[in-house]
Amino acid sequence: MSYCLFSAKVFGNAKVFGCAEVFNDAIVFGNAQIFEDAEILESAKLYDNVMISGDVKVFGDAQIFRDVEVSGYAEISGNAQATKKVITFIDIFCYDITITDNHIKIGCQQHLKSKWENFTDKEIIEMDGKMALKFWRLFKPFAESMGLFD
């Protein structure tokens, strides 16, 4: 049985079902679907074609919108924004790479696209040694040619 407690709002074509809970000042609208054991709380906002399932917790001022699906045991909090555009490369030159609207994550290093584009060789070496620099010298021209910094 789903719950909507306190001043939480669910409207539009949004659906909350299963054991899902929406409470505090959370807002769910548009075509958002929340189900299984998901919890949406505090001032979180979910809208458009969002699907949240599993043991996902969305809280704080987090916003999830557009065509995003979140499942499993994820927690999204703070001022986080889940985004539609995500490109992932697995094990490219020994690094996993994820590219979103504003960020690039290479291995365990996540930075704004503009930061990546302007890192010096010294800064790249400080991240993961000479192997990182070798990778960066191959990947950066590829990223530029693909428009990944745009």
Residue ranges and their predicted role:
Residues 2-83:
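A detector of tandem-repeat and repeat-rich interaction/domain scaffolds
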